[in-house]
């Protein structure tokens, strides 16, 4: 099995390392200038009024800094953060236990918030709006509801699939921030910062070589930095240069556009097996042996953003850029315009 180095998902070891690289305050945070600027205003205003921050929703592809920003919000507000995720909160009682253990002003961070069950969401609505829990006592005709006050808190939700959030839940967030892919300059700066923290000697050209293959994602840039460090140590003099980074990333099968073996497998399946498409998601998932959700949430966003793939009402199609990247000819009778239709 080939290890995937450009997936934005965490491994357990990386979770610990990533925490050490995270900025603690907004002024240290690189990139996302629009979201960062707005957050700074909202945080300063809330602190000035001595109120808890309004509920915040971060959404965007994996690895762009949603968890980091949630921790920064808590740090900037000078409060504690309690972290959990949608799939972990299975029953209303699980959420009630978390909410009743919060202190005034605390941040509750729920990752993958789109995966909360409807029955758990129902408990969350009055908690977000009125800072109360509706507790049902008894059963049947004699059942009654009592309201339990809870501390004022800030809910920070994170999701890769904002479209799956129910409207009532989405409407209760006062601050909604969409996170974008990072530029090469921003990723090079992040790679340089991480290298300093980890005490890794790196040249400017080495930073940019890692950055341009990191798929616009800081988490991937940090992962590639650590793997390139290994090659620099064993195959070089310990310093990450452009040549060392190029050699290492080529050995890891990450090409100069940031595509890895899974991206190539998916794009070449569309080009070679389905004549460029369109092909349905289920058929494509079966053809490459991957889960549909993984294709939609992890693989496709970068390919769509960078013009390698297109979604149409009839399915996925490979774009002209994908054909050029793999040095393939557009099929006879199919114009470049039709690849985008």
Curated annotation (Swiss-Prot):
CDD domains: AAA (cd00009). It catalyses: ATP + H2O = ADP + phosphate + H(+). Homohexamer. Forms an RuvA(8)-RuvB(12)-Holliday junction (HJ) complex. HJ DNA is sandwiched between 2 RuvA tetramers; dsDNA enters through RuvA and exits via RuvB. An RuvB hexamer assembles on each DNA strand where it exits the tetramer. Each RuvB hexamer is contacted by two RuvA subunits (via domain III) on 2 adjacent RuvB subunits; this complex drives branch migration. In the full resolvosome a probable DNA-RuvA(4)-RuvB(12)-RuvC(2) complex forms which resolves the HJ. Keywords: ATP-binding, Cytoplasm, DNA damage, DNA recombination, DNA repair, DNA-binding, Hydrolase, Nucleotide-binding. The gene is ruvB. The RuvA-RuvB-RuvC complex processes Holliday junction (HJ) DNA during genetic recombination and DNA repair, while the RuvA-RuvB complex plays an important role in the rescue of blocked DNA replication forks via replication fork reversal (RFR). RuvA specifically binds to HJ cruciform DNA, conferring on it an open structure. The RuvB hexamer acts as an ATP-dependent pump, pulling dsDNA into and through the RuvAB complex. RuvB forms 2 homohexamers on either side of HJ DNA bound by 1 or 2 RuvA tetramers; 4 subunits per hexamer contact DNA at a time. Belongs to the RuvB family. Gene3D superfamilies: 1.10.8.60, P-loop containing nucleotide triphosphate hydrolases (3.40.50.300), Winged helix-like DNA-binding domain superfamily/Winged helix DNA-binding domain (1.10.10.10). Has 3 domains, the large (RuvB-L) and small ATPase (RuvB-S) domains and the C-terminal head (RuvB-H) domain. The head domain binds DNA, while the ATPase domains jointly bind ATP, ADP or are empty depending on the state of the subunit in the translocation cycle. During a single DNA translocation step the structure of each domain remains the same, but their relative positions change. The lineage of its organism: Bacteria, Pseudomonadati, Thermodesulfobacteriota, Desulfuromonadia, Desulfuromonadales. InterPro entries: AAA+_ATPase (IPR003593), AAA_lid_4 (IPR041445), DNA_helicase_Holl-junc_RuvB (IPR004605), P-loop_NTPase (IPR027417), RuvB-like_N (IPR008824), RuvB_C (IPR008823), WH-like_DNA-bd_sf (IPR036388), WH_DNA-bd_sf (IPR036390). Mg(2+) binds at residue 67. ATP binds at residues 21-22, 63, 66-68, 129-131, 172, 182, 219. Residues 183-253 are annotated as: Small ATPAse domain (RuvB-S). DNA binds at residues 311, 316. GO terms for biological process: DNA recombination; DNA repair. Its EC number is 3.6.4.-. One of its GO terms (cellular component) is Holliday junction resolvase complex. It is found in: Cytoplasm. One of its GO terms (molecular function) is ATP binding. Residues 256-341 are annotated as: Head domain (RuvB-H). It holds the Pfam family RuvB_C. This is Holliday junction branch migration complex subunit RuvB. Residues 1-182 are annotated as: Large ATPase domain (RuvB-L).
